[in-house]
């Protein structure tokens, strides 16, 4: 088994095969506290192209003290439908039953996303697997398309989940972030008005039944992740970070656990490269919580303030039944032009405007999709991310670091214009 010690040391979990062209993309990472286990997922493809995705792969990592020992790679052949390719791993852990739900989509043959959007004919199926032994074995695949989407799928040109992890809210609700290309208008047999919008798939009965929430509108949003942050006592807020084609990241808030979101806003602190890129977000509780903080331009702000990003007058405060003093970590390439220099940003006051730090660069050079996981009992953070020397498709690396490294880093740099 391969051992990965902290801090800030990367280990390659999935490596592109130069001879065959086999490529691993779309990382998803889940940490299971009871067994101190990491589950690292990715797509196995016969080339870098989306339409050449084949199946999902998994590696299990065991925390030993403050390092990780990784087991061998396993093909998840359970996560397949006949005549379909499997894409977009999105795992979530249900703490009451101990089950891991692995969501993904199965897309018919080699039908491209563009083809589905142009013709307005969906070729994707919403599926999941369940594991009751921390990812050692998996049950049979279940197709949830009819149950969750039903007849609405006729208006969805295509859709996907995640990619990256889902979460369980303080209330017990399970959340799987998703997005769909909604067809609002047709001309003859063509879908002439199709826009992507993020939404949530959720379960309130420990994963027995699943439903979907409303689209995040009117901003065009796509791949997304969510995190729960502290609002008024008893009223936690769900924060959503979504990819856009608008050069900046979109942020939206929900006060009803993801059923619907208020109008999203573009954050000028969080740049998207020209083609956009997926990003990851997690909430965490820092060891030391000061009463005031300094933002990236040196202005102090009290720890409790009115929230201008929400329609309702929520305040940030500690509550007995809600997450206490929750901050956010966000991973994303920092360049305004291309996918390079993966940065880790933190936000000490998620409900306030423009409170993101400058990025701590986790990986210099080509960097793509990423997924974060918090190891709360060790005060560590893990990141699974695409990277390489010439392009970001060469490998998927795992890195373990402490929140202290991010919070105390003096070598923070502004987003690159390269």
UniProtKB/Swiss-Prot annotation:
Gene3D superfamilies: 2.120.10.10
Entry-linked Pfam families: BNR_2
Binding-site positions, substrate: 25, 45, 179, 181, 223, 243, 339
Modified residues (Phosphoserine): 312
InterPro entries: Sialidase (IPR011040), Sialidase_fam (IPR026856), Sialidase_sf (IPR036278)
A GO molecular function held by the record: alpha-sialidase activity
GO cellular component: caveola; early endosome membrane; external side of plasma membrane; lysosomal membrane; plasma membrane; recycling endosome membrane
Residue spans crossing the bilayer: none
EC number: 3.2.1.18
pH effects: Optimum pH is 3.8.
CDD domains the UniProt entry points to: Sialidase_non-viral
Recorded topology in the membrane: Peripheral membrane protein
Subunit structure: Interacts with CAV1; this interaction enhances NEU3 sialidase activity within caveola. Interacts with EGFR; this interaction mediates desialylation of EGFR and enhances downstream signaling.
Family: Belongs to the glycosyl hydrolase 33 family.
Annotated function: Exo-alpha-sialidase that catalyzes the hydrolytic cleavage of the terminal sialic acid (N-acetylneuraminic acid, Neu5Ac) of a glycan moiety in the catabolism of glycolipids, glycoproteins and oligosacharides. Displays high catalytic efficiency for gangliosides including alpha-(2->3)-sialylated GD1a and GM3 and alpha-(2->8)-sialylated GD3. Plays a role in the regulation of transmembrane signaling through the modulation of ganglioside content of the lipid bilayer and by direct interaction with signaling receptors, such as EGFR.
Protein name (record): Sialidase-3
Organism: Mus musculus
GN (gene name): Neu3
């Amino acid at each position: 088994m391969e051992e990965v010690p902290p801090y800030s040391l990367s280990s390659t979990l999935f490596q592109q095969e130069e001879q065959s062209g086999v490529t691993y993309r779309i990382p998803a990472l889940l940490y299971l506290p009871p067994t101190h286990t990491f589950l690292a997922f990715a797509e196995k493809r016969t080339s870098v192209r989306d339409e050449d995705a084949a199946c999902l792969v998994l590696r299990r990592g065991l925390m030993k003290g403050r390092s990780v020992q990784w087991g061998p790679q396993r093909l998840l052949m359970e996560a397949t439908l006949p005549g379909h390719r499997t894409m977009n791993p999105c795992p979530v852990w249900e703490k009451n039953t101990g089950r891991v739900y692995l969501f993904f989509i199965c897309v018919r043959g080699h039908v491209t996303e563009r083809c589905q959007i142009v013709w307005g004919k969906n070729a994707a199926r919403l599926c999941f697997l369940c594991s009751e032994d921390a990812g050692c074995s998996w049950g049979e695949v279940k197709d949830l398309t009819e149950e969750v989407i039903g007849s609405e799928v006729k208006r969805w040109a295509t859709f996907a989940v995640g990619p990256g992890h889902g979460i369980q809210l303080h209330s017990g609700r399970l959340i799987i972030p998703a997005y769909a290309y909604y067809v609002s208008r047709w001309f003859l047999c063509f879908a002439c008005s199709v826009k992507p919008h993020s939404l949530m798939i959720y379960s309130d009965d420990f994963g027995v039944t699943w439903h979907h929430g409303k689209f995040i509108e009117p901003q065009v949003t796509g791949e997304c992740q969510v995190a729960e942050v502290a609002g008024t006592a008893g009223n936690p807020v769900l924060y959503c970070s979504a990819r856009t084609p608008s050069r900046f990241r979109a942020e939206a808030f929900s006060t009803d656990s993801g059923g619907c979101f208020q109008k999203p806003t573009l954050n000028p602190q969080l740049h998207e490269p020209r083609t956009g890129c997926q990003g990851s977000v997690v909430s965490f509780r820092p060891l030391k919580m000061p009463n005031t903080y300094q933002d990236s331009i040196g202005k102090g702000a009290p720890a409790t303030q009115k929230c201008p990003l929400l329609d309702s007058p929520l305040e940030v405060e500690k509550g007995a039944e809600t997450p206490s003093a929750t901050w956010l970590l966000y991973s994303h390439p920092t360049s305004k032009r291309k996918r390079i220099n993966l940065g880790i940003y933190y936000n000490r006051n998620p409900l306030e405007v423009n409170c993101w730090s400058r990025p701590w660069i986790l990986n210099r050079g080509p960097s793509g999709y990423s997924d974060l996981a918090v190891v709360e009992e060790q005060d560590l953070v893990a990141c699974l991310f695409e990277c390489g020397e010439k392009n970001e498709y060469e490998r998927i690396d795992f890195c373990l670091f402490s929140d202290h490294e991010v919070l105390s880093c003096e070598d923070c740099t502004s987003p690159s214009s390269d």
